[in-house]
Amino acid sequence: MLGLRFSVRSLLAILVVWLGIILLASPAQAAGDPYVSQYLRVTEPVAIDLDGNQTRLFAPDDFVVGKRLFENNCKNCHLGGTTLPNPSVSLSLAALQGAVPQRDNINNLVDYLRQPMTYDGTEENYVCRQVPGSWLPQKQVEKLAAFILRAAQKAPGWGTSDF
């Protein structure tokens, strides 16, 4: 009986130590995501242009969520910010700024994601899939847009063939 009690106490002690390590050693998500902290240079909230006149602060965790959404839904066609189906139109900042309307702010990029249009804005783009609100709520699609814009601003090689 003494051996069994010692085993249970030992297991409980190990469990408590393990949980303590997990809880105390788990920093904010962004600090745990080297891409967000190192390449996007996000370690504290960052102002991203909403519509040309206003900005909104996005927290490091927002960029982690945006990155995850990009990886799960966009990366197959937009690896490293390129556009594999149409290599001449990437997700580089210059390309986003050159689109009609410009896609270099949250609102316009979200509008594009909701209803993709060709680069010149004249007709629907059927190559890029729509992101309806029933699939991705507004806050989530804004985090995705913030990730794309921050990557276009800061990530080395984003939107080029040099990634």
List where the protein language model places each region.
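Bacterial N-terminal signal peptides
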Residues: L12-L23
